[in-house]
Amino acid sequence: MHEDRKEGAMWRRTGWLVVTVCVLSVALNSAAYGVDLKWWSHWAIEDNKKLVLFEVKKRFEAKHPGNTVTITFYEKANMFPVLRAAFTAGSGFPDVFYYEADVPEFIPAGWLADMSTGIRWENIEPSAKAFWTRPGPGGKMAPWAIAVESASDELYYNKKMFQQLGITVPANGVFTAEQFKDVVGKCIKSGVAAFATGTSDREYPALYIPSELLLGKIGGDEVKKLVRGELSWKDPRVVEVFRYYRELIDMGAYSKAMTSMTLAESHRYFHTDQKACMFPVSSWYTGRSFVPPEKGGQPKDFELGMLNYPMMKDGKGANQKYIGYQGSLAVAAMGPNLALAMEVANTFADPEIGNLWAGKTGIQTGIKTDVPKIDSPIKWYIDMFHQVNRNTKWQDIAVQTFKLNMKPEMWEVWVSILNQGLPNKLIGADEALDKLEAARLKFK
């Protein structure tokens, strides 16, 4: 019996040794061959943003030897339909991917991984974490993405063109509504459009001017009520804004090429072709325009200026401006490499990455930064941005994130009227408001 016990113990030790060897073999095999994580991203033609993503890839791979990351760049308009189809099919999707408010339905569908753990949230701005903390499957509240890009809705202008037209910008960068109408008139009379806006491949470019006019007139809190359906579109203040906006349209503020012009083309229309005085767009303008001219960037001698949006008479939104979190990173909930994919996302949660993003792109970020340590070749722009926005009261909603505050059906009506019908003179101001109010009551 004693020999039997010794033999049993020996076999148990041998068994554990075999198990240990197997585990080590699997670990060594994984380290040797590793995993190639797939990452799909927007920003196909934005080299400065790519530099940041490649730095994240480099840091992740250095920290996780044997594992690699392959980034495939798309234009988001092409990426999201493919991504939706892959998630619906349950195969063919990446481990990590670009995410933003264009596709809010991805969260309740369960396609994004819960980021409650695994991310160094202490290195992310609290407002950025709060922005993507939303109801998921079954109403579960969790953060679902890291807000890499934060962008405000700005109004850029051609300094040289303004000088040639005799337009003097007020010290605070704010024209009154009547002064702004004069500015628009001078641009049009000189043979160029007032606004370099192209709507052929995006659902929001023509929303900037009317949305900012509404903000200036009624203020951020009332705008939120309006987009949530809690305030009537027949409110006299809203009617005033729409009628004023239609006056600008009737003057010829938009280019006749607006409906056939893409977002990328509208950038070139502004800074290279110089066929428009102003460009209402988010502050990610720099991502497309601060690249070499041969890659679509603005000419080296182009004189870029920044305005604040005009103020309507008796406006309640003085110094207010929209800001929102946009280009973000999410992890596929159904991915086979969830832990490693989460580590890719976690690599973004670092002030050094925040500094790199701010310095290379000139765009705000949801990642915490150490401002004195930001090294940037576009410091002149960063200084101008802060000068123009020195008195700005930021409103945590933006033209592109109205979609998160509107019911889907209401958003469709909003886009069809403001991005298509009204700027193309297919519908009048009062008729537009009738349709918006009818939709508000129907989808309330």
Which residue ranges define each predicted feature?
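Helix-loop-helix "hinge/cap" segment bordering the ligand-binding cleft or interdomain interface
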Residues: 62, 66-70, 137-206, 217-260, ...
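Short helix-initiation/N-cap motifs at beta->coil->alpha
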Residues: 73-82, 174-179, 258-271
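Hinge/lid segment of periplasmic solute-binding proteins
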Residues: 100-154, 181, 301-309
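Extracytoplasmic/periplasmic substrate-binding proteins
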Residues: 42, 97, 104, 208, ...
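Short, solvent-exposed loop/beta-turn-alpha elements that line the ligand-binding surface or hinge
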Residues: 116-130, 172-173, 217-240, 293-299, ...
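C-terminal capping/gating helix-and-loop segments adjacent to ligand/active sites or protein-protein/ligand interfaces
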Residues: 138, 147, 323, 366-371, ...
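Conserved N-terminal structural module of periplasmic/extracytoplasmic solute-binding proteins
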Residues: 32-111, 121-123, 169, 298, ...
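Mature extracytoplasmic/periplasmic domains
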Residues: 112, 284-295, 312, 327-408
